[in-house]
Amino acid sequence: KKQGATALSFDTISASGIRSAMPHGIATDKKIENGDFLTLDFGCVFEGYCSDMTRTVVVGKANDKQKEIYNTVLKAQTTAIDAIKAGMKCSEVDGVARKIITDAGYGENFGHSLGHSVGIEIHENPSFSPKNNAVVQNGNVLRLNREFI
């Protein structure tokens, strides 16, 4: 609010442990424990436009498997961001990230879409999924998830 936000874009999500990988996971009575993945998903409305940001961290020290998962997801996200260009099908953008996740052995855990546009509404078109053949346009405001396995 101090910087001009007028509202939250959506209810903030905080999920730990197994629930940290669930799209739109909700908090339970489970206590956050050392070694848990913790996913925070939040956003605000500023000058009439929505934002949406997600971060996943490990509480305490990450083990080797957690580092592998984190780095795989990060690589998928950054590679897809680098690949996006006007004229590209949304399904192609999704495919860039999905291939990295699948090649790392986590494809069956990638049930959520890669991302979506944001604007006046928190979820706008185009969205990034294997079935969406909409084309990325100059001027789209895009959000690629990092919490998708």
Which functions belong to the PLM regions below?
Residues 1-149:
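Active-site neighborhoods and metal-handling regions in enzymes and metal-associated proteins
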